[in-house]
């Protein structure tokens, strides 16, 4: 896996790669979702920063996704999960803030269009896979601009986390803001946290978020850190996107075991959220999981559906 990097939303420049000499302002990318255009195609493209392992057979892959959610002990469920043709995301409304359920749904609803617009801006240029993290950054900035407008109407402090994964020319590209996160089940049965040991919170053991979509009253001066990561797509991979109601209650070893034991994404996602809600008892949070399997497809490449969504 390629090392994750932190970028900054909120007008701070995005370094496109060591030695590239290129920098793109977040302000130049912060387009409302309803007004996304292909204008970014005229910007200088980032240099290639890494190599992918065998992308020649990318069309032979099929991704099967499923999601489950449990309300837990909360009165309502402010989590939301979504997946589409080539991407999936999960969002969790900020606890205690107004309209958390609305904000999480806005984030998920906006991400698909934002991701596709970012890819369209790149076009079919050679080496498009190397621009995956750049496209993910663009998508997050666009979603943040959109939900920030909603947040200003819904009430001060409203916002949501967002974690996403997308397939891009043989790679899986991840993005994250807040404490929702992503894991990959390793070949040896261990669980790898895509974003390292960072929990997305200000203090270890605390609940306060370091950043959230649409929420810029932050401890770090108003700059919302976005994390991205990427890795080659491989047959047999299992990816988990989850809210803090999952990882805060279940140890990594148990999550890995549940992903390994339950063969289908639908049963694995259901087992994970049910056990997380039970582990939390009377104080359990909303728990949501999206499980994605990377499989080898036997269909001709021209007839494949990149993602098969199951519930």
Stretches with model-predicted labels:
Residues 1-311:
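PP2C/PPM-type serine/threonine phosphatase catalytic domain
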């Amino acid at each position: 896996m390629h090392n994750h990097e932190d970028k900054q939303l909120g007008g701070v420049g995005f370094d496109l790669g060591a030695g590239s000499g290129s920098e793109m302002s977040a302000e130049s990318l912060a387009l409302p979702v309803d007004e996304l255009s292909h204008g970014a195609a005229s910007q200088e493209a980032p240099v290639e920063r890494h190599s992918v392992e065998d992308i020649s057979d990318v069309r032979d892959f099929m991704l099967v996704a499923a999601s489950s959610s449990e309300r837990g002990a909360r009165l309502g469920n402010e989590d939301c999960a979504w997946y589409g043709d080539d991407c999936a995301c999960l969002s969790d409304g900020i606890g205690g803030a107004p309209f958390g359920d609305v904000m999480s749904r806005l984030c998920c609803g906006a991400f698909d269009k934002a991701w596709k617009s970012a890819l369209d801006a790149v076009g079919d240029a050679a080496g498009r896979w190397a621009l995956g993290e750049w496209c993910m950054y663009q998508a997050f900035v666009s979603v943040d601009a959109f939900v920030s407008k909603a947040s200003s109407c819904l009430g001060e402090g409203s916002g949501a986390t967002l974690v996403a994964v997308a397939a891009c020319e043989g790679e899986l590209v991840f993005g994250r803001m807040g404490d929702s996160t992503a894991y990959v089940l390793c070949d040896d049965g261990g669980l790898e946290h895509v974003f390292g040991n960072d929990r997305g919170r200000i203090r270890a053991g605390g609940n306060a978020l370091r950043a959230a979509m649409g929420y810029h009253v932050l401890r770090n001066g108003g700059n919302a850190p976005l994390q991205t990561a990427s890795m080659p797509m491989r047959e047999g991979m299992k990816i988990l996107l989850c809210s803090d109601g999952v990882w805060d209650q279940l140890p990594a070893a148990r999550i890995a075991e549940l992903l390994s034991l339950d063969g289908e994404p639908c049963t694995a996602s259901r087992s994970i959220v049910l056990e997380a809600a039970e582990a939390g008892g009377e104080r359990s949070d909303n728990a949501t999981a999206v499980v994605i399997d990377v499989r080898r497809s036997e269909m001709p490449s021209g007839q494949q559906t990149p993602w098969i969504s199951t519930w």
